[in-house]
Amino acid sequence: MEFKFSAVVDPSTYQTQGLCDGLTVRYHKNTELEEIDCLRCQEHWREQVGPLGLYRGGLGHPWSGMSIAIPEALPERLGIVSYANELAFLHDDVTDIAKYYQGDEHNNDLKAAFDQVISTGTIKHAGSGKRALQAYVAKRMLSIDNDRAITSLKAWSTFLEKAGRQEDYRFKSEDDYLKYRVHDVGMLFWYGLLTFAQAITIPENELDTCHQLATTAYLHMALVNDLVSWDKERQSAAALGKDYVTNFIFVAMEEHAISEDQAQERCRREIQKATVDYLRVFEEVKARDDLSPDTKRYLESVLYSMSGNVVWSFHSPRYYTDASFSERQLEWMKNGIPKAQTSEGGASGVDQGEVKIHDRTINGHHAVTSNGTGTGSHDTLNGDGTAHENNSRDASIPGRTTNGISNSDTSLLSAVLQAPYEYITALPSKGFREHAIDALNVWFRVPAEKLAIIKSIITILHNASLMLDDLEDGSELRRGKASTHMIFGLGQTINSANYQLVRALQEIQKLGGPKSLLVFTEELHYLYVGQSMDLYWTSNLICPSINEYFRMVEHKTGGLVRLFGRLMALHSTNPVKVDMIDFSNRLGRYFQTRDDYQNLVSAEYTKQKGYCEDLEEGKFSLPLIHLLQTMPENHVLRNVWMQRRVRGTATHAQKETILELMKRNGSLQFTEDTLGILYGHLEKSIGELERRFGAENFQLRLIFELLRNG
């Protein structure tokens, strides 16, 4: 294995008690990266969860845990794996301190959060405690290496499913205990850390073999942990009123009726045996030609994890009260980590300047305001929040209401009226807007009842707009299924979509106060203005400028974002008042530009909506606007586009022709570059909001990172 980021440690500078003889110890050259992120994790824990007390984690002097156990971690990944490991230490201490029968609850919660981010791309309730920190870990890992991050998150979820599940079981034999301990030590957790840190990919067909070969190494690390943590675990057990300790030393004492010292010596012999056994395993691995280079690199890296774990453990303040921290670590603990390293959100290496084409800028935004009410940031809640009952019962006529329609008739009519809406609502959705609302509520702290109403309003309007969009655009597919009007026809679809405005208005009334209604009508107005611009250009073959295009996007796509942002600001319980207009407009521009790009290049999008659907519908998307403006005299382009108008649609061959012109002319690359800049603007807005609110929003950053990589 090639060594780029570490150096061999002089054996005279550390002690091992003979527990890793024959193994080399290496140490990372950039250990300050670990120190910064371990301390950052502790800061986040204090902010999000609570005080740490006398907590000791992965840091120490002269050796810190990740720098010596994964010495070849890529420098840009060392920080986040150190943060993740520190979070694991904090979680471990919580489950130790809690009543032992509650340990599963903590593991279940962490597992559920990892499962959520894998399956849905977000972590719900990330504004509370540990889940906010998990969202932070996931976001940073996904931003570095999406595929390996997902692999690690899946491995950690599986580990949490098994870890700590027998803490209330009194093991009778060493064999039974060791079988359990190999998994509980975090074989899969360490696998996730190590593969991500060193950018290793184990082929699927070699995964089981890899874990089997590494079992002895993980047993080694488990027993080292049992040896050095014996006093700590024994004290925790006594504090919890337990008469047993889930530790090899305790099991050996009971099984063989031996003293504590004898059991510790027995543990050392098992560790030494595991060292010899794994060295033999690795020698055999090197001679095999049926294993990939990455599998071999992983199994070799585990050697350094074994030796590093021994050296760190014997010098760690986590296990030894006389162990120390470095002067730099103590300085940062006292005064905070370097300010240049405190935020992950601002610059992303993307040029923050404007993108220009033919002197048309796409950076300017149109702030939507009306009579000074462009934001609800300084509004106060008026009214009692109750909805008026418009359909009171007429007691003299059973089964009737005062409007003369029977309840049974109303129910039937409602079912017919709602059927198209319920059809589109039942189609699979990633729920981006709902996740974004949850993330923003980390700042706004809108009461749960009002937040549910805001979500309901946005869901109703979003699905209604999709029904009308598909109908107006002639789209036959929505989320891989037949569009609503292809099932229910034009009339029923239009009627049901329009009725949703009534439902949304009824929901707005539940929020109480006139300002909610004002925000609602303003943003609904702009949403329809944006849609009309889009339809007008398509119908009349008018190619807008890029500025005009983004003005339309801010109305049409940004409208719903502004609506929920302004409603949340209006009903916020946070005393900090912030204008969400700029953020909402930037999100709208990014979201629509991404949609334009995905429509042309994404296989998944083709499956859900059809091949290059925007070209088929004649929409002026950003790539097409760029193409038409940079090739205004191209006869092939002009004639293909005119034929699409004549036919009312575009054939597969015509779409292929336009797509090829986009590739040759750089229109797709322009759109991709624009996305990078728009994402930079979005990150800048998030950073500004974090500074205004005085709190980082890991969940929001995770959502956008997944959106960028999705």
From Swiss-Prot:
Binding site for Mg(2+) 1: 92, 96
Residue stretches of biased makeup (Polar residues): 368-380
Keyword annotations of the record: Isoprene biosynthesis, Lyase, Magnesium, Metal-binding, Multifunctional enzyme, Repeat, Transferase
Involved pathway(s): Secondary metabolite biosynthesis; terpenoid biosynthesis
GO biological process entries: alcohol biosynthetic process; isoprenoid biosynthetic process; mycotoxin biosynthetic process
Amino-acid positions noted as binding dimethylallyl diphosphate in the UniProt annotation, renumbered to this chain: 478, 556-557, 592, 599, 609, 619
SUPFAM superfamilies: Terpenoid synthases (SSF48576)
Region (Geranylgeranyl diphosphate synthase): 328-709
Region feature (stellata-2,6,19-trien synthase): 1-327
Quaternary assembly: Hexamer.
Free-text domain note: The characteristic DDXXD motif for binding a trinuclear Mg(2+) cluster is conserved in both the N-terminal terpene cyclase and C-terminal prenyl transferase domains. The Mg(2+)-binding NSE motif in the terpene cyclase domain is not completely conserved, since the asparagine residue in the is substituted with histidine.
Protein name: Bifunctional sesterterpene synthase
Organism of provenance: Aspergillus aculeatus (strain ATCC 16872 / CBS 172.66 / WB 5094)
Lineage, uppermost ranks: Eukaryota, Fungi, Dikarya, Ascomycota, Pezizomycotina
